[in-house]
Design a protein with these regions (language model features):
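Alpha-helical cap/lid subdomain in secreted, periplasmic
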Residues: 2-5, 25-27, 52, 59, ...
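Bacterial Sec-dependent signal peptides at the C-terminal "C-region" and cleavage site
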Residues: 3-29
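A short beta-strand-loop structural module common to alpha/beta enzyme folds
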Residues: 61-76
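Short Gly/aromatic-enriched secondary-structure transition segments
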Residues: 48-49
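Catalytic nucleophile-elbow at a beta strand-turn-alpha helix junction centered on a G-D-S/GDSL motif
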Residues: 30-45, 73-76, 105
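A structural signal for the hydrophobic beta-strands that form the central parallel beta-sheet
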Residues: 34-35, 69, 140, 203
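Short catalytic-loop micro-motif centered on adjacent basic/acidic residues
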Residues: 41, 68-71, 140, 208
């Protein structure tokens, strides 16, 4: 009789636990969207910075982030603004990395287009506002390099520094985290490019990242993700 009572009690406890488990929802993964140009578009491919970041996260035994790329080759800051409703806001992200600026500078030389600094700042701030109005956390990224010479002799170094300062100033005034890839790349090239090569250290063609360049971006962004609350 005692055994039957114990069995009945254990059965009830088991049923209760199963019922409780059915009401417990798994933790929702934080959705992070990386919003940018061809560097971000390639970031989703093998060896890309988003793919490498996903591997870094999994190596730490973490499984509560969902990484998505929203990069399109050739995009400038106004392209991002025009497509952000469809490519970003509709997906309800928790965090968005804004990583744009290379084409705004580079295309002035290669295509005769580009984006003037004042217009760049206006569109950049407009993107931020649309995100923060939706309570989406934002991380800003400075552009990396157009040419890897470490003595500031690359043609667009001056403009890269100018546009990076625009981003840094916005970040400071609005208390937004900034992933300062420009500074990180400059420091790395000063220490690891003794022959002052134009490409091949962190990029394949002066602009688009090789595996090492992608890894550095992944590492820097992952550090910031862990601090975003």
């Amino acid at each position: 009789m005692l055994c039957r009572k114990n069995f009945f009690t254990l059965s009830c406890i088991f049923i209760l636990l199963v019922a409780m488990m059915s009401f417990i929802k798994p933790d929702k993964k934080k959705k992070i969207i990386f919003f940018g140009d061809s560097i971000t578009q390639m970031g989703m491919k093998p060896g890309g910075y988003i793919t490498q970041m996903d591997s870094l996260i999994k190596k730490e035994g973490i499984d509560n982030y969902q990484l998505e790329g929203a990069g399109i080759g050739g995009n400038k800051v106004y392209d991002l603004y025009l497509r952000m409703d469809t490519d970003v806001l509709s997906k309800n992200p928790d965090i968005v990395f804004i990583y744009v600026g290379i084409n705004d500078i580079w295309h002035k030389v290669t295509h005769g287009t580009g984006t003037d600094p004042d217009k760049y700042e206006v569109f950049y701030k407009a993107i931020i506002k649309k995100l923060t109005d939706r309570n989406i956390k934002v991380v800003l990224c400075t552009p990396t390099v157009i040419g890897e010479r470490n003595d500031y002799s690359n043609q667009q170094d001056g403009e890269l520094n100018m546009y990076s300062n625009i981003i840094r100033n916005i970040a400071q005034k609005q208390s937004i985290p900034v992933c300062d890839l420009r500074n990180v790349f400059i420091k790395y090239l000063q220490e690891n490019n003794p022959t002052n090569q134009e490409k091949g250290i962190l990029t394949t063609d002066r602009v688009h990242l090789n595996d090492k360049g992608n890894l550095i971006v992944a590492q820097q962004m992952w550090k910031l993700i862990k601090d975003v609350r």
